[in-house]
Structures are given as C-alpha cells and as structure tokens.
C-alpha cells in the first residue's frame, strides 16, 4: 500500500531507526506552500516471518514507537480499507475519517467497559474543513483484527454509524489518544 507514496515523495529508508522492532522509517524533506520545509516521515509496520505485519498489534507498536521517537505534530493514517455500498462507498473512493472505533471488541458488562472496548476515538479537529476543501466525503472508520467479519461485527458497525472497515485505524487512533497526538 505504501509503495506508490514512497516513490511519489522520494522518501528513503532510515536503516535500523526502530531496531530491534521490525517497524521501518522512510524520510524526506518537503517544502510547504508557505516556503517552510518539514520532515515527512513514513512509518511502516515492518515484516515478520516473510510477511508484512498487519492488524492492530503491529499498528499499535509502530505508532507508539513512531510517536515516542519522532514527536510528530500529527499522525496521518492512510491505507486501503473496505466500505459499504449502502453508505455510498465505491472502489477507489477517497475518504477522510471523522472518528475511529473498534467493531470486534465484545466486552460484556457495564457501560464503561463497553465504551472503552469500542473506543470511539476523535480525529484531528481540522479534518472536516480539510475534507470540505478537498471535496472528499467523511466516514467513520471501524477496526477489527480479522479480514472477515462476523454478523455481530456488522451489527456493531451499523449501530455505531460505521462506514469504512480498516484493520489498523482504531489501533493507531488509540495510541494517538494515549499520547495526545492528533490523528487524521
């Protein structure tokens, strides 16, 4: 998923930046419209057992390591997700998330446990204005640890207004919320 982005921006790998973790850092300097330069960091979960690391655990580790070592102003979490046609989603349609939640954490008990399990993490306060400026739709991102979906997952997604299914989104938002780092 990241290869076109890496090639477009000409970012180069910073070897062993996160060692001994498998996460990878790619970095370059970009010039903003105001003439100031900024560092663009692209962090990938890495690989293990000859396979790309995917899912909540890998995303949480990579996000935690990145925030602790890089101290970003904002985390932009981009990737490929599934959507629901009934909500207007279509192949290759670009969205900006308006919130992130977990859809596969079924924790019985009182409201506090249920609220904590689902997450419902906010995104960066400028997300709506950015979406309007770019003429992009917004949607609630839901996350689960499996590529498939159980009927009870779909029920949670529908009950909470989920529109986009992305395996890492809420995990990244969770870590950002702990470290008070804005996420888009």
Can you say where each PLM-predicted feature lies in the sequence?
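A C-terminal functional module that forms or caps the active site or interfaces directly
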Residues: 151-184
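Mid-sequence, gly/pro-rich, charge-dense loop/helix-turn segments that line enzyme active sites
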Residues: 80-164
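N-terminal short beta-loop-beta anion/metal-coordinating cradle
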Residues: 1-64
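Glycine-rich beta-strand-to-loop/alpha-helix junction loops that act as flexible
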Residues: 44, 78-81
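Proline-aspartate-enriched helix->loop->beta-strand connector
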Residues: 71-76, 162
